Amino acid sequence: MDGNENPNPARTSLWRNARLATLREELGPLGIIEDGVIAVRGERIVYAGPEAGLPSELARADQVFDCEGRWVTPALIDCHTHIVHGGNRAREFQLRLEGATYEEIARAGGGIASTVEATNALSVEALVEAALPRLDTLLAEGVSTVEVKSGYGLNVEAELKMLRAARRLESLRPVRIVTSYLAAHATPPEFRGRNGDYIAEVVLPGLTAAHAEGLADAVDGFCEGIAFSPAEIASVFGRAKSLGLPVKLHAEQLSDLGGAKLAASYGALSADHLEYLDAAGAAAMAKAGTVAVLLPGAFYTLREKQLPPVEALREAGTRIAIATDCNPGTSPLTSLLLTLNMSATLFRLTLEECLAGVTREAARALGILGETGTIEAGKSADLAIWNIDQPAELIYRIGFNPLRERIFKGERILR
């Protein structure tokens, strides 16, 4: 079969002769099942296990696909991105290479202000067109779920416009989009020095409007000396909780302000970056079930020296996910496979931590682990089939895309 195949709700499909890395924890590292088979009815997995255990009624499938001994994993999940935005910062990158400081670039109209200006200038349709190539690059590597943030509008209508564009992507590609409202990302020039006014006049009204329109799946913020204080973020999180929305936080990227502990106190889905996280913050996150999302693309691009405290996260039992952080300024990265290699090479994550970090734990970081992230009965049939001899190849190789096919909600998407 060629191209995309839409699932019939009553149709049963089998993927046989597969080596499964299910990521189910009860099955041990990577949840491996040799000589595996996956049965899908409509959009849902109804069996994933050894061939010998396949129920006889499922063996009489409407269509059968031979994986020819290939590895099958859950489809990948990029749980932290900013792919909806206008413009790019290539000129700024060039200036940095020539020795310009961040302050000099900002004074010249660069930095986040340039992205805000470019984003505000575009319509929803133009933002969608700008985001599609970034999204397509991720999907081509086996990604089926992408988190998308606002945060480059910094006024109510522009933040809503970004979220509308993110929602539109889901109707144009076979992908699950999870949105995060991130108006508390930076303060625009007209509110400089008046963070409280910006939150009261833009962030909170925008949040209420986004919720009313069904545009926000979660609420994010940037807790840092150059952005918002813990108290300011708390006011945003309080409103989010009153609306029944989960929260997450950019925290401890440049300093330790206690953002991770704040996030944990609100039961946040995740706290992200975390280079300056301390042991107490890691413990608070573990207790709250808040996932640590590590972002090696930003670490690499900014030439950071402070590594996230991976060992402290392990000792605390904090779950770890990884993501591209695709954004125009500090992580212009649209390869989750390269992110896997960076996470292992720069942060010393293990094979199991890396693969769980873009599947099971990434789903946990988005609050959708009940829907996707592992291969097991009851979950969405979101799968990736790879031309590899062993799972380590997904992390070890650089500039290598071994995806054979992607399956999203039971639909085959062939490369």
Curated annotation (Swiss-Prot):
**Recorded catalytic activity of this chain's protein:** 4-imidazolone-5-propanoate + H2O = N-formimidoyl-L-glutamate
Is Protease set as a keyword in this record?
Answer: no
| Cofactor field | Zn(2+); Fe(3+)
Residue numbers binding 4-imidazolone-5-propanoate: R89, Y152, H185, Q253, T330
Q: Which GO terms describe its cellular component?
A: cytoplasm
E.C. numbers: 3.5.2.7
GO biological process: one example? L-histidine catabolic process to glutamate and formate
Its localization reads: Cytoplasm
Q: How is the cofactor bound?
A: Binds 1 zinc or iron ion per subunit.
UniProt keywords (A-Z) are: Cytoplasm, Histidine metabolism, Hydrolase, Iron, Metal-binding, Plasmid, Zinc
Positions contributing to N-formimidoyl-L-glutamate binding:
Y152, N327, G329
Pathways involved: Amino-acid degradation; L-histidine degradation into L-glutamate; N-formimidoyl-L-glutamate from L-histidine: step 3/3
SUPFAM superfamilies, per database record: Composite domain of metallo-dependent hydrolases (SSF51338), Metallo-dependent hydrolases (SSF51556)
Which residues are noted in the entry as Zn(2+)-binding?
H80, H82, H250, D325
Q: Name one GO molecular function term.
A: imidazolonepropionase activity
Give the family this protein belongs to, as stated in its UniProt record.
Belongs to the metallo-dependent hydrolases superfamily. HutI family.
Q: Which HAMAP family match?
A: HutI
What is this protein's record name? Imidazolonepropionase
Organism name:
Rhizobium meliloti (strain 1021)
Q: Which gene encodes it?
A: hutI
